[in-house]
Amino acid sequence: MARYTGPKAKLSRREGTDLFLKSARRSLADKCKLDSKPGQHGRTSGARTSDYGNQLREKQKVKRIYGVLERQFRRYFAEADRRKGNTGENLLQLLESRLDNVVYRMGFGSTRAEARQLVSHKAILVNGQTLNVPSAQIKSGDVVTIREQSKKQVRIAEALSLAEQSGFPTWVAVDSKKFEGTFKQVPDRADISGDINESLIVELYSR
């Protein structure tokens, strides 16, 4: 399955909620009707969505939020199910601990896609070493830094400025002047923002 490269706003409209694919800090609500499905007049149907349909829709939404394809998402779920504790919460914690997501949460990229590009282009150091694998799992205490040559990029400075205005998650500590952040701990479920019902995904894979 190829990665989606079409209009990002269309994906948010399809899910009926802002997935923050275009800008991490600016809502799409003022730009388009999120309650209207893609299409000239929006797709309408009097049929009630089945439980399976709702579960599948939720999985698709989470995949799009984090930019993960199906095979990789299944691996994340299998690992989440293997671990002790709540499977749904484990799944979100694994996704939030991805390097590209941590870079995004620290404000170095305005979107997860932009953060993923920074990682792939070797603009990110983890504990002083270049790491260009977006899916790499970051652990408590890991220090994420922008490579010296990349600190001059205007987009990074702009993204960081917006992040400072909206505030950083409690589970990361960011030193904007140093272009550096510390992954303090894996976030609790209450610390993970987003309109996500992970229990629907657990139900889907438990069928």
From Swiss-Prot:
InterPro entries: Ribosomal_uS4, Ribosomal_uS4_bac-type, Ribosomal_uS4_CS, Ribosomal_uS4_N, S4_RNA-bd, S4_RNA-bd_sf. One of its GO terms (molecular function) is structural constituent of ribosome. It comes from the Bacteria. Keywords: Ribonucleoprotein, Ribosomal protein, RNA-binding, rRNA-binding. Residues 97-160 form the S4 RNA-binding domain. Residues 33-54 are annotated as: Disordered. PANTHER family: 30S 40S RIBOSOMAL PROTEIN, SMALL RIBOSOMAL SUBUNIT PROTEIN US4M. One of the primary rRNA binding proteins, it binds directly to 16S rRNA where it nucleates assembly of the body of the 30S subunit. This is Small ribosomal subunit protein uS4. It comes from Cupriavidus necator (strain ATCC 17699 / DSM 428 / KCTC 22496 / NCIMB 10442 / H16 / Stanier 337).
